[in-house]
């Protein structure tokens, strides 16, 4: 009875007032939850209370750090990680993220950017037993603090296990809490502050390049600074500053005179070392400390040595209109400044580039300056500019170019100017890159030049991408600008005012150039050393600033020695990467007008070998709108430019294989080199020179291709192929003779179709690549050629059903000529040879199974039809 009564009471209708009360409570709860997630920037920050105790402070008075129990650190084993930086950015276009990447790129450190995950997947951090990253950088440290529990534990375990550190930035905004604790850390943040007078903690263990002796007087940029405070001994100040106002910071337990703006976490709290910045990289000292932080947290694996080599070129000596040239006092100041700079840079010597034609073409006072300069000839280094300051790419005749150089050399000999420095610079860097062959030959003929420099390789901007290369025996070094140009001759008239020049020198672009490059060749001009002598002002103040704020050791070397040093540091840069000169307006302006990019091919047949590429080459050549390359005396119809030593002959050599285009827009050049397909170098090289090219590859059963290559080698009496059976070749083990392994590789490796196509897809869009079925090309060529024409977008479609005929004697399709005759490929094509033995076919079917499966996935991803042979192979493996 009582149970029944309770049940009835429970089932009674709920009063409306109670329902409304419950709804109101739920609404309030939802508002709080929405606010929590809407203002997610506050997550990870907890309001600071009064529980912070007053610690003892050393002089100078700074934010506190009290010794607490230490957690033992796992020794860092940097050999277990790859030298790669993982950078978590807010977006691909965020300013701070781009600045972080710019410093890494300038330092030539490898990196990978990822959008910082909130609840998304963390990138794969390990590969087997190796860590994939040596350092983690967060553009917004709150993205790290607020990681979901799974990813946070994953990342922290990785950092502890592999000794990987974290760099993070905290950028306050108008909604930031003025004082808060970083969630999960014994660290307090005080935000939206205006600061001044930044100093460096000399006891900071991460300092390497940074010299801690000075105070950067004045206001720090912005009013949104964050300072750090902690009682834990794991936190060590790196940079400190004062507040602009005399008022104390609310909630700060100690009235500290200096506040920490960059803090180093020694890893005593949780075993992970970190460096946290209380602002972005707009402040120049942050850039310097960031470089040191990268070095420290990677055990100096990602670090440049302290040595910096500097060479200052002065172009246009004797060139310049009246009023812009050096007078006697200017020449004396040049020499005196050189001697002054030698106290900081041993044997520092200005490098003077002269054009003899303009000697004594100034005012009387300037002509006296010319004479005094020549009286100091042994005090400076010298290099030839052009006699008449003409741009070399305008000279199409090498002998005329050589005559100009000979005049400059004659002038040098007459005035005692050294002629054996081995270095030259072309006016406006013309002819250096893009390469003007006549310039390189004339330089070697007249001057014996071994080194030059340019600001144009691979492009002028961004400057951090400039590189060196070697061509035709001449080493080409990257050249840097320094904020001075021919028209910047007066301090007060500097663009943007004198403050802009000082900003470039003192922590700005010029300072960063030296900081991030082990070797810097600076371009200046004669006019920068007359009048207000901005050249002298700039480099005196630059050296002073570097010596004040850094531990860098400034050195210099003559150009040839400097070039050898450069390629000793960067040997991978010796090989050039030729680019399309018409893709960069500056390049086109200093490229011979007799040359045209229309001479480049628009289609490449890349192979692989023994799949029908020569047949396709013949069929394409039948089309009236398509023109193939001229044959090579060494490699017949193939140029083989992008995959081997021919590449170093330059693009002029490459273009000579193609006709000079007519005025019609229908000219369509193509080339076929079947060994491009599996070349590791070719895809990148092709993409650089021919970024819009169409790519065709032909695939047959890789087992048949391997067997065909073996038979091809036997037909050419290859001793290894004659000695070993096909079965012995493809099954040879690691201990087999080297020449046998080489033949095995040429048989098997090109058949890794998916691997090679993916390499091409790293540089070309899928719609630029056409994969043809080699079996159909052999049996139904007319239909295949319809597909090819659509892919190429030719306007005058050709009906190959009417122009191809099957030749029963040859066993394949040939060109149909007038009178019913046919034109077929040579005797070397379509050879008959014994069928492959069953054991070899079985071995190869198993060998290529996974490769073929990956190929099917890749072709599906590319939107391409699976070849008939591939469908058959996949069905047989089920």
From Swiss-Prot:
Signal peptide: none
Region (Heparan sulfate N-deacetylase 1) location: 40-594
Transmembrane helix as UniProt keyword: yes
Cellular compartments per GO CC: Golgi membrane; trans-Golgi network membrane
Residues forming the catalytic site: 610 (for sulfotransferase activity)
Disulfide bonds: 814-824
List of residues binding adenosine 3',5'-bisphosphate: 610-614, 708, 813, 829-833
Segments for region (Disordered): 47-71
Protein name: Bifunctional heparan sulfate N-deacetylase/N-sulfotransferase 1
Name of the gene: ndst1
């Amino acid at each position: 009875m009582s149970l029944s009564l309770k049940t009835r009471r429970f089932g009674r209708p709920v009063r409306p007032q109670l329902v409304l009360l419950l709804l109101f409570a739920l609404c309030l709860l939802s508002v709080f939850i929405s606010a929590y997630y809407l203002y997610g920037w506050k997550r990870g920050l907890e309001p600071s209370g009064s529980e912070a105790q007053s610690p003892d402070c050393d002089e100078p008075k700074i934010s506190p750090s009290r010794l607490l129990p230490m957690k033992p650190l796992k020794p860092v084993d940097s050999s277990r990680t790859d030298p790669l930086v993982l950078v978590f950015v807010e977006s691909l276009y965020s300013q701070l993220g781009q600045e972080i990447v710019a410093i890494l790129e300038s330092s030539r450190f490898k990196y990978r950017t990822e959008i910082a995950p909130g609840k998304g997947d963390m990138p794969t951090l390990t590969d087997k037993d190796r860590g994939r990253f040596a350092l983690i950088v967060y553009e917004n440290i709150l993205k790290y603090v607020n990681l979901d529990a799974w990813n946070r534990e994953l990342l922290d375990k990785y950092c502890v296990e592999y000794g990987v550190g974290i760099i993070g930035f905290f950028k306050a905004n108008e909604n930031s809490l003025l004082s808060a604790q970083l969630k999960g850390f014994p660290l307090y943040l005080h935000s939206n502050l205006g600061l001044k007078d930044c100093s460096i903690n000399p006891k900071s263990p991460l300092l390497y390049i940074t010299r801690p002796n000075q105070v950067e007087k004045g206001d720090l940029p912005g009013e949104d600074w964050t300072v750090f405070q902690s009682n834990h001994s794991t936190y060590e100040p790196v940079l400190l500053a004062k507040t602009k106002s005399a008022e104390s910071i609310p909630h700060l337990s100690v009235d500290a005179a200096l506040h920490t703006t960059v803090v180093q976490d020694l890893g005593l709290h949780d075993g992970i070392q970190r460096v946290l910045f209380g602002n972005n990289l707009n402040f120049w000292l942050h850039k310097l400390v960031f470089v040191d932080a990268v070095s420290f947290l990677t055990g100096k694996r990602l670090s440049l040595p302290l040595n910096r080599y500097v060479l200052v070129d002065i172009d246009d000596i004797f060139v310049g209109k009246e009023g812009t040239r050096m007078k006697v006092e200017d020449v004396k100041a040049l020499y005196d400044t050189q001697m002054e700079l030698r106290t900081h840079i041993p044997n520092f010597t200005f490098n003077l580039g002269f054009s003899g034609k303009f000697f004594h073409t100034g005012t009387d006072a300037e002509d006296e300056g010319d004479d005094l300069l020549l009286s100091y000839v042994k005090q400076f280094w010298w290099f030839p500019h052009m006699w008449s300051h003409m741009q070399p790419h305008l000279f199409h005749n090498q002998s005329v170019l050589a005559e100009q150089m000979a005049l400059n050399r004659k002038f040098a000999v007459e005035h005692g100017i050294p002629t054996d420095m081995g270095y030259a610079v072309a006016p406006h860097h013309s002819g250096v890159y893009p390469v003007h062959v006549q310039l390189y030959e004339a330089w070697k003929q007249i001057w014996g030049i071994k080194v030059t420099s340019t600001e144009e390789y691979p492009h002028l901007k961004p400057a951090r991408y400039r590189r060196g290369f070697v061509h035709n025996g001449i080493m080409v070094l990257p050249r840097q600008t320094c904020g001075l140009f021919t028209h910047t001759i007066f301090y007060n008239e500097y663009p943007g005012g004198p403050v802009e020049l000082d900003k470039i020198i003192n922590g700005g672009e010029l300072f960063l150039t030296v900081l991030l490059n082990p070797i810097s060749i600076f371009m200046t001009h004669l006019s920068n050393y007359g009048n207000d002598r901005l050249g002298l002002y700039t480099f005196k103040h630059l050296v002073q600033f570097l010596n004040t704020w850094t531990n860098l050791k400034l050195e210099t070397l003559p150009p040839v020695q400097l070039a050898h040093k450069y390629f000793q540091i960067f040997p991978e840069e010796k090989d050039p990467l030729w680019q399309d000169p018409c893709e960069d307006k500056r390049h086109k302006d200093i490229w011979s007008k007799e040359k045209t990019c229309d001479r480049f091919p628009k289609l490449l047949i890349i192979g692989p070998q023994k799949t029908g590429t020569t047949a396709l080459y013949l069929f394409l050549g039948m089309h009236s709108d398509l023109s193939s390359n001229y044959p090579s005396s060494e490699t017949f119809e193939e140029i083989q430019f992008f995959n081997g030593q021919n590449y170093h002959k330059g693009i002029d050599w490459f273009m000579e294989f193609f006709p000079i285009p007519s005025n019609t827009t229908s000219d369509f050049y193509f080339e076929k080199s079947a060994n491009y397909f599996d070349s590791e170098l070719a895809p990148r090289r092709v993409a650089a020179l021919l970024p819009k090219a169409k790519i065709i590859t032909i695939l047959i059963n890789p087992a048949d291709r391997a067997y065909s290559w073996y038979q091809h080698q036997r037909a050419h009496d290859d001793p290894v192929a004659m000695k070993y059976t096909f079965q012995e070749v493809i099954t040879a083990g690691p201990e087999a003779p080297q020449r046998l392994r080489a033949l095995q590789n040429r048989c098997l490796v090109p058949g890794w179709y998916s691997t090679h196509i993916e390499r091409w897809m790293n540089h070309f869009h899928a719609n630029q690549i056409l994969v043809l079925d080699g079996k159909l090309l052999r049996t139904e060529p007319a239909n295949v050629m319809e597909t090819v024409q659509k892919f190429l977008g030719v306007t005058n479609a050709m009906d190959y059903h009417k122009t191809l005929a099957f030749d029963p004697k040859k066993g394949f399709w040939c060109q149909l000529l007038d009178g019913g005759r046919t034109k077929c490929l040579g005797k070397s094509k379509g050879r008959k040879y014994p069928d492959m033995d069953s054991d070899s076919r079985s071995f190869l079917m198993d060998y290529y199974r996974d490769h073929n499966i990956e190929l099917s996935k890749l072709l599906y991803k590319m939107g391409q039809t699976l070849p008939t042979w591939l469908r058959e192979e996949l069905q047989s493996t089920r």
